[in-house]
Amino acid sequence: MFKESPIIRRVSRQIMVGNVPVGGDAPITVQSMTNTLTTDVAATVAQIKALEAVGADIVRVSVPTMDAAEAFREIKKQVNVPLVADIHFDYRIALKVAEYGVDCLRINPGNIGNENRIRSVVECARDNNIPIRIGVNGGSLEKDIQEKYTEPTPEALLESAMRHVDILDRLNFNEFKVSVKASDVFLAVESYKLLAKQIDNPLHLGITEAGGLRSGSVKSSVGLGLLLAQGIGDTIRISLAADPIEEIKVGFDILKSLKLRSRGINLIACPSCSRQEFDVVSTVNALEQRIEDIMTPMDVSIIGCIVNGPGEAMVSDLGLTGSSKKSGYYLDGIRQKERFDNTDLVDQLEQRIRAKARSMSERLDEKNKIDILTKD
């Protein structure tokens, strides 16, 4: 098994979104977007804090009006995670939230207006040390680009992005990242591949308007997986018509599956068949809910029989292999004398997983202390 990802990431510049680095050798960040009314400060703050609690590195907030900008001011005071203001149509809103300490400005080339307006936003961003995201979307391209290509194409999205990259370059502004999102997987993937060849700025990945929880997760996993596996991407957002918390979970699961960022339990489980010695599906479903709060990276295998069970368990931090009445238990790849009663697996597994997580976390903390002392 690969313990580390074989993926070689594309070389990119690094920018700072608040205190979070994006690009360069920084970990790929996972972000989401609030779906509350921004003018409802209490609801928006509560959702941002919930997103932060499940691991969101960055949160984007829509700011469609000046009233929303005033609400954003209050929201920013009450949260710790870096906030991106999502700006469309009225560039003056970007200028206003810049005064209120926004950590990044997202502007849409398709509707932000002419170069003079962009210049105003850039100058304000520079004065306040705020990065910008050029956020191209296949559904809102500039009118002349729509007329030129008649429909969204990779070349159309690239032209829109490069038009605004060139503007920022002429203004000698380098603190920006770029996205070229589309709801079609192939369109998005090809657009990002073209863009990655043209610039070295950080890339924000996403399949826009991907769909509901199941279908959107699949589309996003396929699209982002294709790009990330080629080393493309510095920050990701999973766009789902679902609770934004699910976007963070899916985002981390994608990175975990590619070994690009480890966080939480990597649960390896068989789909079950007539050979299973215990109810694998119900065990895994119950266990997932019990251990989703554990952040320590760990491989746990739950296999219902002895065909693949021992092999998976031997390369896992903790493994269970189904056997009649009592199942075999492995720790660090070594079979233990202890066996688990098949009628009480979830409680037993949760206890062992939590104990193992504590042990691994303590070892990691000790290693980090040694590394710091060595560097000093």
UniProtKB/Swiss-Prot annotation:
It comes from Colwellia psychrerythraea (strain 34H / ATCC BAA-681). [4Fe-4S] cluster binds at C270, C273, C305, E312. InterPro entries: Dihydropteroate_synth-like_sf (IPR011005), Enolase-like_C_sf (IPR036849), IspG_bac (IPR016425), IspG_bac-typ (IPR004588), NO2/SO3_Rdtase_4Fe4S_sf (IPR045854). GO terms for biological process: isopentenyl diphosphate biosynthetic process, methylerythritol 4-phosphate pathway; terpenoid biosynthetic process. The keyword Iron-sulfur applies. Converts 2C-methyl-D-erythritol 2,4-cyclodiphosphate (ME-2,4cPP) into 1-hydroxy-2-methyl-2-(E)-butenyl 4-diphosphate. Keywords: 4Fe-4S, Iron, Iron-sulfur, Isoprene biosynthesis, Metal-binding, Oxidoreductase. Pathway: Isoprenoid biosynthesis; isopentenyl diphosphate biosynthesis via DXP pathway; isopentenyl diphosphate from 1-deoxy-D-xylulose 5-phosphate: step 5/6. This is 4-hydroxy-3-methylbut-2-en-1-yl diphosphate synthase (flavodoxin). Gene3D superfamilies: Dihydropteroate synthase-like, Sulfite Reductase Hemoprotein, domain 1. Pfam families: GcpE. Binds 1 [4Fe-4S] cluster. GO terms for molecular function: 4 iron, 4 sulfur cluster binding; 4-hydroxy-3-methylbut-2-en-1-yl diphosphate synthase activity (ferredoxin); 4-hydroxy-3-methylbut-2-enyl-diphosphate synthase activity (flavodoxin); iron ion binding. Its cofactor is [4Fe-4S] cluster. It catalyses: (2E)-4-hydroxy-3-methylbut-2-enyl diphosphate + oxidized [flavodoxin] + H2O + 2 H(+) = 2-C-methyl-D-erythritol 2,4-cyclic diphosphate + reduced [flavodoxin].
